[in-house]
């Protein structure tokens, strides 16, 4: 960068933001142009905490009081010193005041800050695009830069540079942030078990096919990419007998497809145990229904080649590849060269697919129909498969099979969730844990997985669920997080 002839004030402004400039290589040209030409610019910072933090929101008043040292918020929410990653503390002091040195600390080394946060639980203020999946973003007064309705002009951690005293709020509103471009932001919701059968189907027969999603449908529809793991085939004639149900042989009525369409399903996983329950004809019929509805599928297909083929999806400039397989002993609805069904897990093949996709700039998303365990942390076989594909480069590794919410293992480059629980299935009263589940809303920005929001749901009957109350959510997250792990990166050790 040539700086000769640069005005002194502009030069020092550039130096103050140099660490940010170096960290965000993909946006450095836009930033440099704004600084050198003294154009008004905005940089979005996020309030973040380790992923296993329970708190979701803090009021601006409590945040400001903590900053100034006039509040005991720390003992309830903010843990330890608040670490602000910046080389220009004065801009934050202009917003919030000098600050209590016992409460806040300005740091320039982002790796050291991330390490301290993971090891000690400190909260952070970091540039939005420097987030990674080991950290959750804390809302301030219910505003959150991960959300589609985010308004940077109402966000207290929006840093304005190169403005002048004549600029109005309307002028600033027209300035687009340098490090948060909505055209590069993708939200993806991954879900657990869907099986529109038995008790769930009975409610749908009475109240209509869209009934199970009555309380959560709007949230599902809002996702740019909604994943559904539908374990059961559709049948032209689906009239289940008591004998079939006793043997756990399932089918869904064709009308049930309307529910999947109504919630905006974008991709369907077909590696479930029950995919061949009604024979080859039902599988072919199911595949045709999805094709006619323009809902792409993966993990199952008309033959083994189709079942094993990664599904490529692109949204807001981010490219993804969905790969799915059944990790139980061979025989569960398995496809072959001549028969339709689910892909049995071939881990060496998946590892090679992941590496090839990653080299092409595509983000691999691997979902498993694996062993169904009614405990929080997986057994050795399950953990080995999940970690093998994570080590190969899978960005997300998600367990679609579990009937209860399970633990997480998260590194800088890979997010593992061993099981989410039921999305639509009639186990509300089987065990207390089977009435609980998560929806994992993953956020990607400019080709990078930057954060995940865990939405928690609870069943009220065998078909209908709702979002949890705060106390219900806290209890579930505490239980899951107690057996979850966050790893340091090599640069942070």
Show where each model-derived region lies.
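Bacterial N-terminal signal peptides
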Residues: 14-23
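Generic N-terminal amphipathic/basic segments
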Residues: 2-3, 32-44
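Sec-dependent signal peptide cleavage junction
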Residues: 23-35
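Acidic, metal/ion-coordinating pockets
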Residues: 173-493
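Residues marking helix boundaries in flexible regions
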Residues: 3-4, 26, 37, 355
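Bacterial N-terminal signal peptides that target proteins for export
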Residues: 4-14
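Exported/periplasmic ABC-transporter solute-binding proteins
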Residues: 38-179
């Amino acid at each position: 960068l040539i700086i000769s002839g640069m005005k002194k004030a502009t030069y020092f402004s550039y130096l103050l933001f140099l660490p940010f400039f170096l960290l965000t290589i993909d946006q450095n040209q836009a930033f440099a142009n704004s600084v050198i030409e003294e154009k008004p610019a905005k940089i979005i910072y996020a309030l973040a905490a380790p992923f296993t933090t329970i708190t979701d929101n803090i009021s601006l008043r409590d945040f400001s009081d903590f900053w100034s040292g006039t509040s005991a918020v720390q003992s309830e929410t903010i843990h330890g010193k608040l670490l602000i990653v910046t080389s220009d503390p004065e801009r934050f002091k202009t917003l919030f005041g000098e600050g209590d040195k016992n409460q806040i600390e300005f740091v320039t080394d982002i790796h050291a800050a991330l390490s301290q946060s993971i090891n000690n639980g400190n909260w952070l203020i970091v540039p939005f695009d420097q987030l990674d999946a080991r950290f959750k973003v804390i809302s301030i007064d219910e505003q959150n830069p991960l959300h589609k309705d985010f308004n940077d002009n109402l966000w207290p951690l929006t840093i304005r540079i190169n403005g002048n005293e004549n600029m109005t709020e309307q002028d600033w509103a027209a300035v687009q942030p340098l490090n948060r471009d909505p055209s590069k932001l993708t939200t993806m919701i991954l879900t657990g078990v869907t099986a529109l059968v038995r008790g769930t189907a009975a409610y749908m027969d009475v109240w209509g096919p869209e009934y199970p999603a009555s309380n959560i449908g709007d949230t599902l529809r809002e996702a740019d990419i909604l994943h559904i793991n539908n374990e059961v085939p559709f049948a032209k004639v689906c009239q289940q007998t008591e004998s079939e149900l006793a043997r756990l042989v399932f089918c869904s009525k064709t009308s049930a497809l309307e529910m999947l369409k109504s919630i905006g399903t974008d991709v369907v996983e077909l590696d479930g145990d029950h995919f061949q329950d009604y024979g080859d004809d039902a599988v072919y019929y199911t595949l045709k229904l999805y094709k006619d509805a323009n809902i792409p599928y993966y993990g199952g297909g008309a033959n083994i080649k189709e079942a094993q083929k990664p599904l490529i999806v692109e949204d807001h400039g981010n490219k993804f590849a969905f790969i799915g397989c059944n990790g139980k002993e061979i025989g569960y609805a398995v496809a072959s060269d001549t028969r339709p069904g689910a892909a049995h897990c071939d881990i060496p093949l998946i590892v090679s697919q992941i590496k090839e996709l990653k080299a092409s700039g595509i983000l691999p998303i691997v979902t498993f129909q694996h062993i169904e365990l009614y405990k929080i942390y997986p057994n050795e076989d399950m953990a080995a498969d999940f970690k093998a594909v994570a080590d190969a480069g899978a960005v997300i590794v998600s367990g679609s099979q579990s009937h209860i919410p399970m633990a997480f293992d998260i590194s800088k480059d890979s997010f593992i969730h061993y099981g989410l629980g039921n999305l639509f299935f009639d186990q509300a009263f089987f065990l207390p844990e089977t009435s609980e589940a998560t929806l994992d809303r993953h956020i990607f920005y400019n080709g990078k997985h930057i954060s995940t929001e865990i939405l928690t749901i609870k069943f009220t009957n065998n078909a209908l669920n709702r979002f949890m109350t705060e106390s219900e959510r806290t209890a579930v997250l505490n239980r899951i997080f107690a057996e979850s792990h966050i790893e340091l990166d090599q640069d942070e050790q």
